[in-house]
């Protein structure tokens, strides 16, 4: 089933209102499941949410974006802070936030410990231990765990 057909179906089933604008996938979305554009009424969806979290979660995200869509065109409060939006989202069982996706781009955490005071530091980037020292006692830093790259 095409994305546009699916969104139209969800709109009719859950909102009893037609969806008449454009829908597209947007791979560049990272922290959100979808986006509504009031200027022209189209919706963007994150394909990773559908691929990794499944159709059930994706349907709830479609409902969320359709809440923005239908409330905007009814002239009601369509933003997250508005009561109309919160009530409609609850009524159609949409998601308020997207569950976190398994992030393949995350860097492993490197753990450093001061040899003098035992203070630990967690960093995503490597620290040059010959150049940098402990911020508390100026002691020498030692890399404790070497993550697999």
Swiss-Prot record:
Co-factor requirement: Zn(2+)
Record-annotated SprT-like domain positions: 6-143
Main location: cytoplasm
Residues reported in the UniProt entry to bind Zn(2+): 64, 68
Keyword terms, alphabetized: Cytoplasm, Metal-binding, Zinc
InterPro entries: SprT-like_domain, SprT_Zn_ribbon, Uncharacterised_SprT-like
GO terms of biological process kind: response to stress
Active-site residues (renumbered): 65
Pfam families from the UniProt entry: SprT-like (PF10263), Zn_ribbon_SprT (PF17283)
Gene Ontology terms for molecular function: zinc ion binding
Name used for this protein in its record: Protein SprT-like
Source species of the chain: Streptococcus pneumoniae (strain 70585)
